[in-house]
Amino acid sequence: LFLVRDGDGFLLGQGTNREAEQALQAASNDGWVKTPARPVWVTHEDLFSASLHYSMHLHLLIPSLFWPDSSLTGIYQDLSLPALEGLLSKGAVEEGGIREVEAWLCDTFGIAKQQDWPVAPITLKADGREIGKTDHGYWLRADPVHLHIERDQLLLADSRVFRITPAEAEELTTALNRHFAESCPEIAFLPLHPARWYICLQDIPPPQTHLLSEVVNKGVRELLPYGESSGTWRKLFNETQMLLHEQPLNRVREANGAPLINSIWFWGGGIMPVSFQSDYTHVWGNHILAQALALSCGARHSALPLEATVLHGTSPSDKHLVVLDFLEGKASYSDAYGWRESLKELEKHWFQPLFAMVKQGKLHQLKLSVLGKKGNKDFTIRSGDMKKFWRTTKPISVHAD
């Protein structure tokens, strides 16, 4: 067997050296390959391996790749990002509306929005709770948060900026459950993870809520539960806030200089979806919803590796989804320095290896889905795009606009 490859084209034949040379000349005359070129002799096994290698698809979900505040004009200054800028410039781009990570993931895995995006019943299983016959109700996330006053606003901080141990979560939820046991026994907090608490509703009308990621570092007064049952849930929001403020644990945290766990954010309610669908065979990432969705649809899941080269050693026929959310927390809390440093790390450990893999034809397709406060953009890059010299490399600031 002989194989001639140029760009995205292959020429396969079988025969003698002379027949290979004649086939190559014919392909050159027809414009299939560029001259000078030589045939490469391969075995059947080589050919099979090469065809699989070239079929690998990789999809990166990258929230906050672009800095959300356009007024900070110097945010990209002196950032050396040749690989990232090369990928963004060579790829075809499609623009879309603003979507949070949770909404994007649910939609990608075929999950329709209910009253809320049904994050709670999906992450429940990943956090170790099997939904049994008795609790097929409406599940709601009730996550511990820290509220603080800044410039006459009550701002919310999530568990990315404070630490809460399993023992602390157990102590706080026990105190809350003891309080509600008589007045409202349906409100029972389940701390399956220190930073992720749950409630199962049977009779109380559920609220309409905002995703926790929509509220981080924002004033909460305009983002409280809404809809027909908003009065009930705003009352619960205030009541739990007062109860948590009185807890001895918070006095200890205050004395130690740790942020108080002084409120709960209700969000992500719904019933368990009937079905899940996905083209991905492998999901990589530390985001709990991505992990839970992979679990629910039967795809493999792995923690996010330190660098992209790890993916090169996986099955070449896989379709991979990688959730790169290093930048989201930094952007949400306006940490410009931390965001820039994280972007430098992504360039070194992810974008440089991926740029090389695409250029060498080791990836059939690389897609970057960038989620941002000004809108979302999809950049699709194929191996052949690297030869499109007319697509000149532009700085990241151009792609961010």
What annotation goes with each model-predicted range?
Residues 286, 290-401:
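C-terminal structured domains
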Residues 74-169, 175:
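An N-terminal, globular interaction/scaffold subdomain
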Residues 15-39:
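A short, charged, amphipathic alpha-helix used as a generic interaction element across diverse proteins
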Residues 77-80, 166-176, 236, 240-243, ...:
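Well-ordered, non-membrane alpha-helical segments in soluble/globular domains
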Residues 163-191, 247-258, 262-263:
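Extended, Lys/Arg-enriched charged tracts that mediate electrostatic binding to polyanionic substrates
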Residues 1-7:
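Short aromatic-glycine-(Arg/Gly/Cys) micro-motifs in beta-strand/loop hairpins
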Residues 204-275:
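Loop-centered beta-sheet repeat module
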Residues 43, 132-133, 169-172, 179, ...:
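Soluble secreted/lumenal catalytic domains
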